[in-house]
């Protein structure tokens, strides 16, 4: 069916050239990304044991409530306010948390730093500022929720909420600013990339770091925090001796399906416009995800003799993670390669927790940290461009690869150090349930509920 639209349906509107089409797409993308957090709750809930499924899902829903409030109050300001006010940030790490506190300033019609009333960061001049806030808020929410998979079945809910509030403030917002807000890991004149390889006539880095939708900010960040917590919190009783099997595999499959669906908002929405690049990102996201799912299943078949539904779901997530930073920089063939390698790497990496003795309960490290690192660094090999520096496999030199390795390492080091500090602040308050509570089930002891009442 062909839908007839008026000639001016997608023309810019407003004094600043804001686009109704772009605005509608970013709002839709924000809703899609928000839907990913309930999807993650199903994914993690299904992977958990029956006695802890509600707690696992509550950690995701708790993050949704807590981080949303914090982001409105000071989160956006800490990440992006310098782009609106023109003020300097603090050491390339953080913007002023009070400059846009509560966001009411973004509803005013007075001119901003560059004379516009719309969004003024990163070239998204066709989308109002408050719409971009909505989109960015959903990223912060799911990043915190992702970490919870590493502490499943043994961390107190209240302590988890306290940790999440501190962590998103001291780790997520600074890293978001560093990468996307003109900080140390951006293409700005004061960034690390500019110091390594110089700047062009406009003051931007000659070799710009590439993180299209959150390989560093979301996945390396969450994965590294998960590793720290898994090590410091300790193992579940019976780890390495008892098989902790998923209690509801249909939940896992449902969660993976919701995540895949929502990820189109995550990646395609990061373009900030309904244009050709958005189509490229959609295709690349699909290609990488499908390739990762298949390669994970091949690894399972060779290693274990079976291709499992949990493996398929995990492969989907690994592919989505890997393509996140690279989705706007690769060809479809490059995306297939990136995804296929991600599926293999993550399928092998999830076994490292048994070798090194850390209890990453739901494989946040093996999937998000490993695939996030590969996706970020793989850009230096597979990036395709006729104008900007390309990856090594497409005629480029070493520079893009070096920049990608540097931003990945900085993210790992920054998140690791800060998460250790936060963990030692929270730990004395009592962050782990007792052995008795763990045996009984954290659903009953923390929430006074059970998931299933079967006669």
What residue spans do the PLM features occupy?
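Glycine- and aromatic-enriched membrane alpha-helices
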Residues: 2-455
């Amino acid at each position: 069916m062909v839908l007839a639209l008026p000639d001016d349906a997608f023309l810019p509107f407003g004094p600043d050239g804001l686009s109704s089409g772009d605005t509608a797409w970013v709002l839709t993308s924000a809703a899609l990304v928000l839907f990913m957090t309930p999807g993650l709750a199903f994914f993690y809930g299904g992977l958990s044991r029956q006695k802890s499924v509600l707690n696992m899902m509550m950690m995701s829903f708790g993050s949704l409530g807590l981080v949303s409030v914090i982001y409105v109050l000071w989160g956006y300001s800490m990440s992006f306010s310098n782009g609106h006010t023109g003020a300097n940030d603090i050491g390339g790490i953080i913007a002023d948390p009070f400059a846009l506190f509560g966001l009411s300033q973004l509803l005013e019609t007075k001119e901003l730093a560059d004379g516009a009333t719309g969004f003024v960061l990163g070239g998204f001049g066709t989308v109002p500022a408050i719409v971009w806030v909505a989109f960015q808020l959903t990223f912060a929410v799911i990043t915190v929720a992702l970490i919870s998979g590493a502490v499943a079945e043994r961390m107190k809910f209240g302590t988890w909420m306290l940790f999440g509030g501190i962590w998103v403030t001291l780790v997520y917002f600074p890293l978001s600013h560093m990468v996307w807000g003109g900080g140390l890991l951006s293409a700005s004149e004061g960034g690390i990339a500019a110091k390594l390889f110089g700047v062009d006539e406009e003051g931007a880095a000659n070799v710009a770091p590439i993180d299209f939708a959150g390989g560093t900010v979301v996945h390396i960040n969450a994965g590294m925090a998960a590793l720290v917590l898994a090590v410091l919190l300790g193992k579940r009783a019976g780890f390495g001796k008892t098989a902790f099997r998923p209690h509801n595999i249909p939940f896992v499959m449902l969660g993976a399906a919701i995540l895949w669906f929502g990820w189109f908002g995550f990646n395609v929405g990061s373009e900030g416009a309904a244009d050709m690049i958005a189509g490229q990102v959609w295709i690349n996201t699909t290609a990488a995800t499908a390739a990762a799912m298949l390669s994970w299943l091949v690894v399972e078949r060779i290693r274990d003799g079976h291709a499992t539904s949990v493996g398929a779901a995990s492969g989907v997530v690994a592919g989505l993670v890997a393509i996140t930073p690279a989705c706007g920089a690769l060809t479809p063939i490059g995306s297939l390669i990136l995804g296929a390698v991600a599926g293999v790497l993550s399928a092998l990496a999830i076994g490292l927790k048994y070798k090194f003795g850390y209890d990453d309960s739901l494989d946040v490290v093996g999937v998000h940290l490993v695939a996030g690192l590969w996706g970020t660094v793989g850009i230096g090999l597979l990036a395709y461009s006729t104008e900007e520096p390309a990856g090594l496999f497409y005629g480029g030199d070493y520079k893009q690869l070096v920049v990608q390795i540097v931003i990945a390492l900085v993210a790992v080091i920054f998140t690791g150090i800060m998460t250790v500090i936060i963990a030692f602040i929270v730990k004395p308050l009592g962050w782990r349930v007792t052995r008795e509570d763990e045996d009984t089930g954290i659903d009953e002891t923390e929430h006074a509920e059970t998931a299933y009442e079967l006669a």
